[in-house]
A protein has these predicted regions:
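Short, basic/aromatic recognition patches
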Residues: 14-38, 76-80, 89-96
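A short, polar/charged loop-to-alpha-helix boundary motif
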Residues: 61-74, 126-135
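Gly/Pro-rich active-site capping loops and adjacent beta-alpha segments
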Residues: 115-172
């Protein structure tokens, strides 16, 4: 299929705008200053089957957009029965992560009843457990000492937050009452992206 330059530019900018809207929704609602002020986050759109990057916004950190590709691929490998409204959480550095405090949310995007793409974001959480606040310790000798490590797990099931999984996460991190102020905006951002991408298509 061939695209003329004008159509290509319209599609490219439309997809970029979807990512920007996700990013702005996340940063405006996030509780943590490291996300809302230091802007340590990013959003992207990924291929339905391969998990490869399709589009990224102008506002987030480019390094996250690249590593989210591998996290999205890890989700795809484990999410054979993804449904609308599902949101997966992952921070495992061995599955395409950076460090453990960079938590990824990955959501399947359905269009006309079929899986069409994946929407993903990364946010740096101030703490996700481990032997010291913030996760960085010169005395750590293994990854288990650094932070709680999450393989791809479905945190939202068909739009409903799994309170049991949430309680496991919050029970293993400091200032847990503040993290819900990042979790909900981070999960809501791809929902904003869904609406924008549907309108674009």
């Amino acid at each position: 299929m061939e695209l003329d330059p004008v159509t290509l530019a319209v599609v490219q900018n439309g997809l970029q705008q979807v990512c920007n809207e996700m990013d702005l929704a996340f940063v405006r609602a996030a509780f943590s200053p490291v996300i809302s002020e230091a802007l340590d986050r990013s959003d992207g759109i990924y291929h339905r089957d391969t998990g490869e990057l399709i589009a990224q916004g102008e506002l987030g950190l480019p390094v996250f957009v690249g590593t989210m590709q591998f996290s999205t691929q890890a989700v795809i490998a484990r999410a054979a029965k993804a449904k609308p409204g599902d949101v997966y959480i992952v921070n495992d550095p061995y599955l395409g992560g950076t460090h453990l405090m960079d938590v990824k949310f990955v959501k399947p995007f359905f269009y006309r009843g079929r899986l069409f793409a994946w929407l993903a974001n990364t946010g740096h959480w101030p703490d996700i457990g481990g032997m010291v606040p913030g996760g960085f310790s010169a005395n750590a000798t293994e990854v288990e000492q650094e932070c709680l490590r999450l393989p791809p797990v479905r945190l939202y099931k068909e739009g409903v937050l799994d309170e049991e999984i949430l309680s496991i996460i919050l029970s293993n991190i400091r200032i847990a009452d503040q993290r819900i102020g990042d979790i909900k905006p981070q999960a809501a951002a791809p929902t904003i992206g869904e609406k924008s991408l549907t309108a674009l298509l």
